[in-house]
Amino acid sequence: MIRRSLISRLALSALAASPLLVPGPLLAQDKPVLHVLVGFPPGVGTDNLARMYAEALGEALNATTVVENKPGAGGQLAAQALKQATPQSNSLMFAVDHQIVMLPLVTKNPGFDVKKDMLPVARIVNFFTCLAVPATSPVKDLEGFVETVKKDPAAAGNVGVPALGSQPHFLTYVLAQHYKIDLKAIPYRGAAPAITDLMGAQIPAAIVPCDALVEHRKGGKVRVLAVASDKRYKPMEDVPTFGEFGFKMPADSFLGVYAAANMKPELVKQVTEATRKMFESPKLVEKFASTQMEPAYAGPDDLRSLVEKNTAYWGEQVRRSNFQAQ
């Protein structure tokens, strides 16, 4: 009897220690949590894609992923937060290339160092930039745009861009130099207000992300003149590229993933491999493409090389334009 009682108590003790009986919240504590920083507000294209990525990463690693929006200063606040992240926070940043390439070029003190404070994980998509005019504009193509600006630069030469110091800002400069015309970049607080003014013909032209124009073009509200790339943009395959007009520039922009420099090396390796494997899933690749951006995986080394090339090119345009760092 004593023996049976002892065995019963031992059995109960073993069951109590079993993970199957541990309450849910305790189990959740053992599940890793990854924080994905996004430098833009909820609901915009970058945020939507970041949430798709975070969900896929969580499933791949059996982890909880938390998307944290830190909008402001063109993504600068999110990049600074990545630098300040602790190793225990398991922090990643879903970055637009403006944060990685342009901010260090146009900001006196960005508050982070791309080479020291973050590790490249992968490029996820390319996104394209378009030159567009209102649908009511008499301008029908790039040649017509150039001729119109030459005739009346004061009326036709203002070009809306998403931000001061952005790639579209300096693409305006490149266009002006190439065609020897007088263009003036008019900075907005993001692409959305620039597009609103474009559709209302409050501004004669704009250079903004193509994905933000797809539906407006279908609705007959804007006319897209050219895509800043050397290859055509699938949702607008009838629109010529700047490459077709003789431009040589690394104009494709990208969205990619960076890890905090102090993230545990084993976790960085796991995140990197999980991200690579995402592109083996046609369903997930199609989901990424639904954002009107182009799925375009590149690993850490290729992403690092891409950033170096783009930084060299845009850095030269910044210097030539005599832009004063803010």
Residue ranges and their predicted role:
Residues 1-13:
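N-terminal secretory signal peptides and thylakoid transit peptides that target proteins
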Residues 28-116, 158, 164, 180-207, ...:
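N-terminal (or domain-start) structured segment
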Residues 31, 84-91, 105-193, 242, ...:
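Hinge/capping helix and adjacent helix->loop/strand transition within the periplasmic-binding protein
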Residues 31-33, 178-179, 218, 265-326:
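An extracytoplasmic/periplasmic, membrane-proximal ligand-sensing/linker region
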Residues 97-99, 126, 136, 211, ...:
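Solvent-exposed coil/turn segments that connect beta secondary-structure elements
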Residues 99-108, 174-178, 205-237:
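A ligand-binding cleft/hinge motif common to bilobed small-molecule-binding domains
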